[in-house]
């Protein structure tokens, strides 16, 4: 019987929240275990709060974790005996994954279960019943194959996520190989965790694999994982990305690391509309609405979306999904998947799907749709594990708190709630701190990133640095990125266009002056800009500058949740301490960082 063990770091509560002591010697070990089946909710200085939810447990089950393994881990780290209801809840949630299966039998698509009582419950459910074509027995239902995604989505809402074993179409064949030497002359091979991720996803080509999400830190080579999955599939592939810069990055990597030719790779963006056996498209083009310019508002990250998926008839470029016999759809940065693309994804469940992301966190609450329509989490690795192995850089995170001038404080106090964040985030006193930090890193490659263009324009003027915003032409962006990579410029000021798929491997300092409210995904993406391993074990530095005692500081705490879950710790600096602050240069354990820089290891 489990007894009181005060030396352990966890307290598991009956509401399925879990408290983790930060100062406990076993903190890091317990944190990495919890991350496999629980989500971090709060991270004050001494005690972090996690939540065990049905979705977090279903993702764990899909990755192969059993209820007994989860309970064993909790008991191993818990101070007190586990509440009995928590044991029951965990066993129940895990048992629900796969109790309903989706299979193909004699040319018909079936929902099946070995539990007649559950089948009866489903048959009478108001959401499930309209999707049934006919009931075949006391345990089997026939559904329309076109409703495959919608049925899975409904089953997640009901609480019985289906294990999809109905298989996939093979798609138009496309034969190519991975290079052993890149076009630039560097040796190329998959890293061990990249190979593991692909094998878990592919599942030997069986119906048990072929759909799902691979979660890896920025800079750990998610693009390479996608390319390796394409090599397994050997079929026509549609790749969806956040922006045109990412499209070009995918094209460069495919040409550099595979035997695919330029004639086999097409760009489908605002500038080109080439459909080839491998086509790379942006989410923004897909969600273009003739009466709603750009439709970029459809991207994830705003206010929570309606549970109803949107009508696709007014999105002309959605026809791309049916323009070729795709065998694989790759969703780069899947946490940004816009609602209209969810809708089309629900209708193409017969095609293999691979999501790539650094975080499954969505600010719109649609993680369940990623689970049901793209697939469950198939592979995840703690960021700090890859850091210890030297595959990503060691990063020191700093939160720099600045005061607000007295007259500004009064304006802030009387501002509306909507205006308060903008007012605090654009605090003029941040500008001097940016200049000081940039001076302390005069020999480094520094990115300054923020949300508000006037603020960024002033920073660019003070630092005499180029500014890239959404209005910057793609050609100009690529020219500046190329100059930064070549070491011709060492400062770049970026708007939120710098959040995603910007390949700047030598950047080792990032200064964040403002962001999208409390967005955890944005914080993770921005840190990812400096995660490529550095020469000689050099440290990377991530600074977030916030206005103290305002909404800016509150949102910063929310933004940091995901990175805290991954083991990052923010050191607090006050503005008066910055002049005397000296950034550390070398990682404590630079063991393998140096050997992992260059060639194949710089791949995105």
PLM region spans:
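Conserved helicase ATPase core of P-loop NTP-dependent helicases/translocases
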Residues: 248, 264-267, 447, 454-458, ...
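Conserved SF2 helicase motif VI
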Residues: 360, 517-542
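Conserved helix-turn-beta segment of the N-terminal RecA-like "Helicase ATP-binding" lobe
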Residues: 245-272
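Extended alpha-helical interface modules used as scaffolds for assembling large macromolecular complexes
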Residues: 1-178
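SF2 helicase catalytic motif II
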Residues: 285, 291, 295-362
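Post-DEXD/H (motif II) to motif III coupling segment of the RecA-like Helicase ATP-binding lobe
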Residues: 327-328, 333-398, 563
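Walker A/P-loop
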Residues: 207-229
């Amino acid at each position: 019987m489990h007894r009181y063990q005060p030396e352990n770091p966890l307290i598991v509560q009956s509401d399925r929240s879990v408290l983790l002591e930060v100062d406990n010697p076993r903190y890091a070990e317990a944190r990495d275990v919890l991350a496999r089946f629980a989500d971090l909710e709060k991270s004050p200085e001494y005690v972090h709060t996690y939540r065990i939810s049905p979705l977090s447990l279903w993702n764990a089950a899909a990755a192969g974790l059993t209820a007994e393994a989860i309970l064993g881990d909790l008991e191993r780290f818990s101070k007190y005996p586990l509440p009995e209801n928590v044991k029951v809840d965990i066993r129940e949630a895990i048992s629900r994954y796969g109790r309903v299966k989706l299979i193909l039998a004699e040319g018909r698509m079936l929902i099946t279960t070995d539990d007649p009582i559950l089948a009866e419950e489903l048959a009478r459910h108001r959401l499930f019943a309209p999707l049934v074509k006919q009931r075949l027995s006391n345990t089997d239902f026939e559904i329309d194959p076109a409703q495959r995604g919608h049925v899975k989505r409904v089953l997640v809402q009901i609480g019985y996520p289906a294990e999809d074993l109905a298989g996939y179409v093979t798609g138009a064949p496309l034969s190519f190989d991975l290079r052993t030497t890149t076009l630039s002359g560097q040796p190329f091979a998959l890293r061990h965790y990249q190979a593991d991720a692909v094998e878990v996803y592919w599942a030997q080509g069986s119906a048990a694999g072929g759909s799902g999400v691979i979660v890896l830190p920025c800079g750990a080579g998610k693009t390479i994982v996608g390319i390796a999955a394409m090599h397994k599939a050997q079929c026509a592939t549609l790749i969806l990305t956040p922006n045109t810069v990412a499209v070009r990055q995918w094209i460069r990597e495919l040409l550099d690391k595979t035997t695919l030719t330029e004639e086999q790779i097409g760009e489908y963006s605002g500038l080109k509309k080439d459909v080839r056996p491998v086509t790379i498209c942006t989410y923004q083009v897909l969600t273009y609405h003739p009466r709603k310019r750009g439709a970029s508002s459809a991207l994830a990250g705003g206010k929570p979306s309606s549970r109803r998926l949107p009508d696709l008839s007014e999105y002309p470029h959605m026809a791309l999904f049916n323009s070729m016999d795709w065998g694989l759809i790759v969703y780069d940065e899947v946490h940004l998947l816009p609602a209209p693309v969810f809708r089309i994804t629900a209708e193409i469940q017969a095609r293999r799907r691979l999501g790539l992301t650094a975080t499954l966190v969505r600010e719109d609450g649609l993680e369940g749709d990623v689970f049901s329509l793209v697939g469950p989490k198939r592979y995840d690795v703690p960021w700090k594990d890859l850091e210890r192995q030297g595959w990503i850089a060691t990063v020191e995170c700093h939160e720099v708190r600045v005061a607000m001038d007295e007259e500004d404080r009064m304006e802030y106090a009387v501002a509306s709630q909507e205006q308060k964040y903008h007012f605090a985030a654009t605090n003029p006193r941040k500008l001097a701190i940016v200049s000081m930090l940039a001076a302390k890193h005069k020999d480094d490659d520094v990115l300054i990133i923020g949300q508000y263009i006037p603020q960024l324009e002033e920073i660019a003027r003070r630092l005499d640095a180029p500014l890239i915003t959404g209005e910057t032409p793609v050609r100009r962006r690529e020219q500046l990125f190329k100059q930064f990579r070549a070491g011709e410029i060492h400062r770049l000021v970026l708007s939120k266009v710098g959040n995603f798929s910007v390949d700047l491997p030598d950047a080792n300092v990032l200064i964040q002056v403002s962001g999208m409210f409390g967005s955890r995904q944005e914080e993770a993406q921005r840190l990812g800009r400096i995660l490529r391993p550095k020469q000689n074990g050099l440290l990377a530095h991530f600074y977030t500058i916030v206005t103290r005692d305002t909404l800016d500081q509150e949102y910063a705490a929310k933004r940091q949740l995901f990175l805290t879950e991954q083991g990052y710790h923010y050191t607090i600096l006050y503005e008066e301490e910055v002049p005397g602050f000296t950034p550390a240069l070398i990682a404590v354990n630079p063991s393998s960082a140096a050997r992992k820089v260059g060639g194949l290891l710089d791949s995105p």
